[in-house]
């Protein structure tokens, strides 16, 4: 009995030491490891290698926790005081949320805390697009604009909120493209999505709208 208790304690300690496991707070939150922001491929070389890859991906193996952390930080992480991000945002709305669909579940990225909120443990990758390869890739990002945050002094501006939200999304998507080029990962941004199906699966509010999706995978 004593050995069993000790063994359980050791297993618990090992899980606590694995990034995103012990810090998962009962499975609701996954704390990402700090992003590695030093080094990397020179910008001009990454621009030269940037490309869109449609299917033909390699093995459906998940990205490592560290690569996922680096990717999300590059996409729209906090890079200076005041909560400002790696991607510009019109009027500093910061109104684009990044949802992740992977084989093991659905998640929402919190850039301020640099962690993932677990929204579900089912494989819902198919909702991320209409192309067959979205279910083959280890990661699909879904960019959702929150129009409730697209305001000036609390006043909504419907005449510009959608256009500016598309621009904000594009900034983030390009950051992901450059990161993937640097890490030699396959990537493609996609507009062929079903916003209604996404809204239902992600349980979005009426003020939220799916803008684009982006697939990340390993090359074959």
Residue ranges and their predicted role:
Residues 1-9:
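Bacterial N-terminal signal peptides that target proteins for export
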């Amino acid at each position: 009995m004593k050995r069993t208790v000790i063994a359980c304690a050791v297993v618990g300690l090992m899980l606590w030491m694995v990034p995103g496991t012990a810090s998962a707070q009962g499975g609701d939150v996954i704390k990402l490891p700090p992003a590695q922001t030093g080094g990397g491929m020179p910008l001009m070389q990454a621009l030269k290698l940037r490309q869109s890859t449609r299917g033909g991906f390699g093995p459906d193996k998940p990205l490592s926790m560290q690569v996922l952390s680096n990717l999300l930080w590059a996409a729209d992480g906090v890079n200076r005081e005041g909560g400002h991000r790696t991607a510009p945002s019109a009027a500093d709305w910061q109104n684009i949320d990044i949802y992740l669909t992977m084989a093991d579940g659905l998640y929402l990225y919190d850039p301020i805390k640099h962690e993932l909120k677990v929204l579900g443990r089912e494989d819902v990758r198919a909702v991320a697009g209409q192309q067959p390869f979205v279910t083959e890739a280890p990661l699909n990002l879904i960019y959702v604009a929150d129009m409730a945050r697209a305001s000036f002094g609390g006043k909504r501006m419907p005449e510009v909120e959608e256009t500016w939200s598309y621009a904000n999304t594009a900034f983030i998507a390009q950051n992901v493209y450059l990161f993937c080029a640097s890490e030699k990962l396959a990537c493609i941004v996609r507009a062929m999505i079903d916003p209604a199906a996404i809204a239902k699966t992600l349980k979005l509010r009426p003020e939220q709208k799916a803008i684009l999706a982006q697939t990340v995978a390993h090359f074959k």
